[in-house]
Structure formats: structure tokens, C-alpha cells
């Protein structure tokens, strides 16, 4: 869609699949225990035309609707759109960097730091990709057999 092309970025749309933490009775989540993390996350798909409501202080994983392929000589950054930020909704917590060679849908780490619940719709433009040219192509890009590229070709939100 030509409307997604901005002067220095490409707008990305929200996908329809989300993962949220279940309310649990546990004192902590162990990031080394993949089964532990999976057990405490709940997946949902939002039907077309309906909204995903993110409440204040809530966190959710989602993906972009777009499947991207980053060439070996580019790096990309995910930035939230100002329209989301002005509602108190962030699109990434720490993982705003997309490696050269990455292929897949980009996982968004959505947080509502505002005071009101916010409706998010699949297909809505929520973030943008900003590309930067590297001086030389990556020697071992994301997806290279020598790398542990666990999110390569992901289609759904992936937890840690």
C-alpha cells in the first residue's frame, strides 16, 4: 500500500494474533524455562473488524501483518507511530532492532502506559520500520546456519 511509504520509513500494520500473560499464582517467571513461559501465555486471534483492547499497565505480544525480508546489507529499527505514543501505547519494550538477514513477521511488544484502555485493530498502522544501510553486508546475517536464529521465518507472536 503506497500510503505506508513515508519519507524515511515504512508504516507497518498490526496483525490479528496476540499473546498475553495469564493471571497466575507464581512469584516469578523463569526466562530459562521455555515451558514455564509458554504455560503462562495465552494466545488469541482477533476477528476482522473487531478490536484488541489493551488496558493500562497491560503487556501483549503481537506481530506485524507484513512479512519482511531484511537484506544482508541493511538493518531496520521498529519505531512506534506518534499516534500510538500519544495514546500511551508503545510498540516495543527493548526489541526494536531487526538484524540483517531477518525474515518473518516482526514481533511487537505492546504496552499501555496510559491511563485508559485503548482499542487496537488488526490492519491498523501502529509502527514503522526505519532502514539503515551498513557499510558492508553482514558476514553472518540472521538466519545463517552458524547462528541460533530462533525467530527466523516466524509467523505468530513468539515468547522468549
Which stretches of residues belong to each language-model region?
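DUTPase catalytic domain/fold
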Residues: 1-160
Amino acid at each position: 500500500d503506497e500510503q505506508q511509504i513515508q519519507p524515511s520509513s515504512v508504516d507497518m500494520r498490526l496483525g490479528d494474533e496476540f499473546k498475553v500473560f495469564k493471571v497466575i499464582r507464581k512469584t516469578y517467571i523463569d526466562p530459562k524455562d521455555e515451558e514455564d513461559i509458554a504455560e503462562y501465555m495465552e494466545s488469541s486471534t482477533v476477528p476482522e473488524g473487531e478490536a484488541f483492547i489493551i488496558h493500562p499497565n497491560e503487556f501483549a505480544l503481537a506481530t506485524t501483518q507484513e512479512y519482511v525480508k531484511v537484506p544482508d546489507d541493511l538493518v531496520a529499527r521498529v519505531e512506534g507511530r506518534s499516534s500510538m505514543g500519544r495514546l500511551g501505547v508503545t510498540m516495543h519494550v527493548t526489541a526494536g532492532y531487526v538484524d540483517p538477514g531477518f525474515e518473518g513477521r516482526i514481533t511487537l511488544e505492546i504496552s499501555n502506559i496510559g491511563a485508559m484502555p485503548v482499542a487496537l485493530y488488526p490492519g491498523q498502522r501502529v509502527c514503522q520500520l526505519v532502514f539503515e544501510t551498513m557499510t558492508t553486508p553482514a558476514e553472518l546475517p540472521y538466519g545463517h546456519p552458524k547462528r541460533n536464529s530462533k525467530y527466523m521465518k516466524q509467523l505468530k507472536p513468539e515468547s522468549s
